[in-house]
Amino acid sequence: MQYEIVSAGENVGDEPERERPVAQAAAAPGIPRPAALPAAGAARRGRDLPRERLLARGPAALSDAELVALLLGSGLPGHDVFALAHTLLTRFGSLRALLDAAPDDFKGLRGIGPARTAILVAVVELARRALAEKARERPLVDSPGAVDDYLRLLIGTRPREVFVCLFLDARHRLVQTEETAHGSLTRMAVYPREIVRRALALNAAALIVAHNHPSGAVRPSAADRHLTRVLRDALALVDVQLIDHFVVGANDTFSFAQAGWI
């Protein structure tokens, strides 16, 4: 990615309905016993089982498709909710891609209307907010794993490059996260002057910056290293510390600080 570095001059109820046991017919010569459950009851029991396992054993006991099915709630005529969940995972390629999808990505998908779209999008937003809340509770330099998780969830699977700034207070706790630049397929214009201005407006004492590589490869380019030096020097002029620059992929991150490049 080439950078343009622009200078100053430029269901009601929580309890599932339980199946009532089918009475066993008296054993009589030549008369078979009835099935333990009718077909419809078996299907409903199958739908309830993941919910019961989650409550009894925790969410880790469920597969990705089962967790998605719990979010969806019900299926379509002729297709149960598990088939719908599998269809979604196949359509998007992975759970991460499904949950990172924008609302428009669900348009035209059979069985996914506005209500289910809102649920799927809200789940990821809740996760982002929970991680941001965690980042505000203690210095980010003391919890690098939380920073990695937050950044991967925030920009790790974006289809285009995004440059984000994490503005920190004097104790290195998160004050605010802002997306300061968005790239095309080949370029992204980053304005150090504007980043400095926002740091001063937010009374930030330090910054962590990050951008994603949609390819998934997180090794920094020469342009990434040059941008980091320019931004570090611009912030130093106003006594704001650049703590780290992360390059983020869907499954990995690269830290300039850990590499000794800041």
From Swiss-Prot:
Biased composition (Low complexity): 22-43
UniProt-listed GO biological process terms: proteolysis
Glycoprotein recorded as keyword: no
Chain sites annotated for binding Zn(2+): 211, 213, 224
Keyword annotations: Hydrolase, Metal-binding, Metalloprotease, Protease, Zinc
Stretch list, region Disordered: 1-45
Superkingdom of source: Bacteria
Protein's UniProt keywords contain Protease: yes
Domain MPN, first and last residues per copy: 140-262
The family this protein is said to belong to: Belongs to the UPF0758 family.
Record protein name field: UPF0758 protein BTH_I0781
Organism listed in the record: Burkholderia thailandensis (strain ATCC 700388 / DSM 13276 / CCUG 48851 / CIP 106301 / E264)
